């Protein structure tokens, strides 16, 4: 148990780790080979998560969920990070932006999502708007009492299984000293809505089976009732979601790095060269020491950022630091593990080459490493009035 965690928190982590080992690991090879998660396996994972009481555990008790703190939820995500993203998607963590649902939206979207009856996906990124989210082209124009949407989104994770989507769309533009500034609104869009389609996206080397899809809007008419939150208030909602998601990326990177390290440590303790275990050679032993030190440091950095969220303290810089360090740490750890395994580490008969491929995307999605460095330095300079 790491410093500062209670016995109850340690039990949460152990419970989820056991779940991943029993319910996720056995199916990973199939998903890696086929690029698909069979419906029966997805349903099985979802049902067992509901039985455990962990489904939508990031939602408050007021909607019948576990109401875990940010630290507790980070522990859950850390252990889920050990397993396949394609499979642990069905562990069920709906976007907590849904807490902004009002009126009929609560019964149509929020409650079915937290009960596991409907799955959601969040759509923000566009072909020309990744890090520059205000550069989005997907737009909605008022037409009578409705909104008419045109444009597209891409790299949308979980869209293949989603029943509805939370889509961020430009709904206006303001002129500022720095040029045009888009106003953004969040919309709830049901699969099958006329003028809205979901199609296959790109083939990725990372996280096979965890598909990214393309959403297209062609004069798609959405009533005002589909607006989530306030009109033109989507950017603030999106920013809040992004920072919370960056903690998830950081803590899942820690979990994945621990699994990779376990492989490397076991191999170093068993593999013999020149008449002794390779772990006894200084070169390998120092690599192992560096790996575990970086993993523990990333873990503590991430939990500290989550703790600041729980205490409602300013945390943007701390979250950016955690995401930056943990995602880059994962890359270093997976690379070192490959080196320790030598040629065997690159063979697809073993999981290390998969972990190596999967690690690459963590430095890109939900805010690139460069964006995190920008946030960190910006906050440091702002504190000095610069």
Language-model segments: what does each one mean?
Residues 93-102:
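Helix-loop "lid/cap" segments that line or gate small-molecule binding pockets
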Residues 1-88, 103-105, 112-117, 130-133, ...:
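Alpha-helical interface subdomain recognition
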Residues 116-124, 168:
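A short, Trp-centered hydrophobic/proline-enriched beta-strand micro-motif
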Residues 68-69, 132-134, 158-162, 178-182, ...:
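Short glycine/proline-enriched turns and hinge-like loops at secondary-structure junctions
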Residues 53, 76-81, 169-170, 189-194, ...:
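Short Ser/Thr-interspersed hydrophobic loop/turn segments at strand-loop and sheet-helix junctions
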Residues 135, 192-221:
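Flexible, small-/acidic-enriched active-site or ligand-binding loops
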Residues 150-198:
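A short core secondary-structure module
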Residues 137-139:
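Short, surface-exposed charged micro-motifs
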